[in-house]
Amino acid sequence: MFKWAQAALANVAGTKEPIYGPEAIRSVAEEAKTTPYTETTKDDLKWQAMESTCVETQCFYFMTDSGQLAFAQVIYSNVAGIRTTCQFNCKVFSLDGSKPHLWCSTPLNNHEFSEDKTSFYATDCAVELSEDGNSYTIKSLNDERSIVNVTIKRTAPGFKIGTSGTTLFGTDLANPWGSMRHVFWPRCVAEGTIATPDGPVDCKGRAMFVHALQGMKPHHAAAKWNFCNFQGPNYSAVLMQYTTPPSYGSTVVNVGGIVKDNEIIFAGAEGAVTHVAIKGDTENDWPEPTAIKFEWKGTTKDGKQADAVLEGELEDKLDRIDVMAEVPGFVKQIVAGAVGTKPYIYQYAPQKKKLTLKLKLGEEEISEEGYLFSEATFISA
């Protein structure tokens, strides 16, 4: 009970959590031992909209046929059950560095959900799941610099790892005090536009969607993150890795998979991420990576051992985000007061040389070049 009270205090006051140890986390990898993944249904896409501390997001990544990169994101956040805030973010990257990235982050008013919780609405904003559960339409008029009207349709099944997609946190895991959940649509097609001051961005091309829920303070759940979104002509690969703070035993959790049109090749919790080379960031002491290796392991539906590797130079980072300087005030409230917390996100999309996804499915070997969008996030040491 005392530890639960400490956790409750840490959630409200931003104090540092005590050391609970690895026994205070049940990784989704435990579920994945017997059920590596489950294909998503419409129910999996419902907003949880928790009434306790949480950050819940739906994020849509666009890799356009014309070679542009962008994302749109809705964030729902609750601080200690006291205040709920929603935000719409849109970013259009300047891949050649000739101009600043377009970054628009707008607080939303009058948010609500559809009756079945699968669609989100606010003033001048709508993120709607179609009746058949296979496509989303994202519309935002909240910032005249980025007027979004895009539809994505999945071309492969979505998945969650294990049966729930969820890692639980707490000393009594039957009554957890925290959670982390991810649901993916790794391979989609997009159409529509983002109207910007430099003209419309035609989003026709590939897309990826992830619905994430951190049912606790973000810096309590993870000390660092790695994210891979790879899109090739025939294959898509996604990997999300997070490492908990020492309070939960610095536990590493990997969730990801490889898909092609109409089929999940394999998915599970046996991935790995290695920062093959780092140069370090002189401004904040974080070990900024310059080369990376993503790995996936699993079993195909017909029982073949499956492995995949994506490795290469990250080239110059696209962006470095000082989270505390850029995130909305409500997220700062969640992180405020946390000792040793200085979150930075490093974003990459190698342009000079495409990376190659190397698949081994049983005896069959497949290599495919494609486009990578990757993030390395450092929150606390």
From Swiss-Prot:
Record-stated family: Belongs to the SVF1 family.
Q: What is its main location?
A: Golgi
Name of the protein this chain belongs to: Ceramide-binding protein svf-1
Membrane topology label: Peripheral membrane protein
Q: Does the keyword Transport apply?
A: yes
The organism sits in which domain of life? Eukaryota
Its GO CC terms? Answer: cis-Golgi network membrane; cytoplasm; endoplasmic reticulum membrane; nucleus
Quote the function comment for this protein: Ceramide-binding protein that may transfer ceramides from the endoplasmic reticulum membrane to the cis-Golgi network membrane, and is thereby required for the biosynthesis of complex sphingolipids.
Q: Which GO terms describe its molecular function?
A: ceramide binding
